[in-house]
Regions:
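ATP-dependent carboxylate/phosphate-activation module, predominantly the ATP-grasp catalytic core
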Residues: 72, 94-160, 164, 171, ...
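Peripheral (often C-terminal) accessory segments that flank ATP-dependent C-N-forming ligase machineries
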Residues: 42-44, 207-320
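Active-site nucleotide/adenylate-binding loops and adjacent lid/helix of ATP-dependent enzymes
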Residues: 16-91, 97, 108-110, 133, ...
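Short, well-ordered beta-strand elements within core beta-sheets of diverse protein domains
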Residues: 66, 94, 195, 276-284
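Positively charged, low-complexity/disordered segments
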Residues: 1-14
Length: 320
């Protein structure tokens, strides 16, 4: 990754988890025990307890990220993560039970402003980390205050001035542990989710920032309940997306996103890079949200060349 000057300490290789973890520990920002490995080394993991999480140190999307329960599984996952990593190293850390929270901030003149936080709902009982939904609301007011405190710790430690800031954390028993952070907005369709939840057009503000202007943020809570549902498919070649525009035109969905295009081949449904599409739903109550999602799922289809629906339906029933 490139060095980026953010008005103070130079942040090198923002996607480099080794560098990031080192600084989290140095500045006493809560995070899990970890080790950086370029090959299997049991002595480095003496005090670790299974299950463990293995990640490439420097890699896009969630490729190579695995949860392992045994030494044999660790060997396989480590070899894969090292291959995926640009640095040929992997990070191994203890798996933290709890809710995964994705929190977006905008740093304005060295002060972190809270935009929104969502719960990254994953598929149950799997070794991979397949995110099925980003759910809102995810936290209460007290937890929002704690998130702001952690974000400001990161801002102060790195002397950040004007930049988006994404922090991913685990929440358990009202305690946060930082998984990772980066000076960027969330990828894919996250920009739209931020806008719908907070009223902030983060994409436009980021462009203004790059052009030398100083965007001013005034986030507010726009909706009561929302969910971004991610769509995965069974293996096959996509021929057409059915039902999306009709649901948008009839206001069942707020927005939809096609991450794949017609003619592309789907081989698996594991990482964020495997998603075929996504759609955003808002509601006034949790029950209304669930009813909308159930109806939408029944109306959508992704057809292959033979007219067979290869969309994985009912995924919202499989979340943790």
């Amino acid at each position: 990754g490139k060095s980026v000057d953010l008005g103070g300490r130079r942040i090198i290789k923002k996607k480099n988890k080794s560098y990031m973890k080192k600084f989290l520990k140095e500045f006493n920002i809560p995070t899990s025990q970890y080790a950086i490995l370029d090959s299997f080394d049991n002595t480095a993991l003496n005090n670790f307890h299974y299950p463990l999480v293995v990640k490439p140190v420097d890699c896009n999307s969630s490729k190579g990220v695995k949860k392992v329960f045994t030494e044999m599984e660790l060997h396989v996952a480590l070899e894969s993560a090292i291959l995926y990593s640009r640095t040929n190293t992997a990070i191994v850390e203890e798996f933290k039970e709890g809710e995964e929270i994705s929190a977006d901030f905008y740093v304005e003149k060295g002060i972190a402003k809270f935009l929104c936080a969502t719960n990254s709902a994953k598929m149950r009982n799997t070794h991979s980390f397949t995110i099925l939904q980003s759910r809102y609301p995810a936290i209460g007011d007290e937890q929002k205050g704690e998130l702001l405190r952690i974000a400001q710790q990161i801002v102060d430690a790195f002397h950040l001035e004007n930049t988006p800031l994404l922090v991913q954390l685990i929440l358990k028993d009202n305690h946060f542990d930082v998984l990772e952070f980066s000076t960027r907005m969330g990828g894919g369709s996250k920009y739209k989710l931020i806008e719908v939840l907070s009223g902030v057009n983060i994409m436009s503000s980021y462009v203004d920032l790059i052009l030398g202007e100083s965007p001013r943020m005034a986030p507010w809570e726009k909706v009561k309940y929302a969910v971004m549902n991610y769509i995965y498919c069974y293996p096959g070649i996509i021929n057409s997306f059915e039902g999306f525009k009709n649901l948008l035109d009839n206001s069942f969905i707020e927005e939809y996103f096609l991450y794949k295009t017609e003619g592309m081949e789907i081989t698996k449904a594991e990482t964020s890079g495997d998603r075929a599409a996504g759609y955003l739903v808002v509601a006034s109550t949790e029950q209304e949200l669930q009813e909308k999602v159930s109806y939408i799922d029944s109306q959508l289809a992704i057809l292959n060349n033979n007219g067979v629906d290869i969309m994985c339906h009912g995924l919202s029933d499989l979340v943790l």
